[in-house]
Regions:
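C-terminal cap of thioredoxin/glutaredoxin-like
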Residues: 31, 35-140
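Ordered, amphipathic secondary-structure segments that act as subunit-interaction surfaces
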Residues: 1-29
Length: 140
């Protein structure tokens, strides 16, 4: 499976380096950091891209607070506030609620896209799958 994903990434300019990944981190803190970025007016998408790059390209431990804070500051977030966001636990309830909702929807991994709250697309799918799902959602 990793070879398939790595090959797909090459075509899209994403150099997956699965051999660099030494740990499967707990991502609760990372999700909390994304919520902080959303609420602080930062770019959650830039943060998410940086987190994915750190993990899948560099093999960094994105469960480590210092790593998360460095990544946050790299994308322009305030380091002190980012650290407080992940260490304080103030976003934990929201993260857990999101995880419960994901479980309710049958989400077991990423990527997973939910359209219109009703249609789930699991895994790396071709564009045609998304087009078909969007057409279906619009038609109903």
């Amino acid at each position: 499976m990793f070879a398939h994903v790595a090959n797909a990434g090459v075509g899209d300019g994403i150099p997956f380096q699965f051999d660099r990944i030494a740990t499967a981190p707990n991502t609760v803190r990372g999700h909390a950091l994304v919520l902080y970025a959303q609420q602080s007016g930062g770019s959650p998408w830039a943060l998410i891209e940086a987190l994915f790059s750190a993990y899948f390209e560099q093999g960094e431990d994105i469960g480590d607070v210092d790593t998360l804070v460095r990544i946050a500051t790299d994308v322009g977030l305030d380091g002190v506030e980012a650290r407080a966001a992940v260490e304080s636990g103030r976003f934990d309830v929201d993260v857990m609620q999101s995880q419960r909702e994901a479980a309710r929807l049958g989400i077991r991994g990423v990527p997973f896209v939910v359209l219109d709250g009703r249609y789930g697309i699991s895994g790396a799918q071709p564009v045609e799958v998304f087009e078909q799902a969007i057409r279906r959602a619009l038609a109903e």
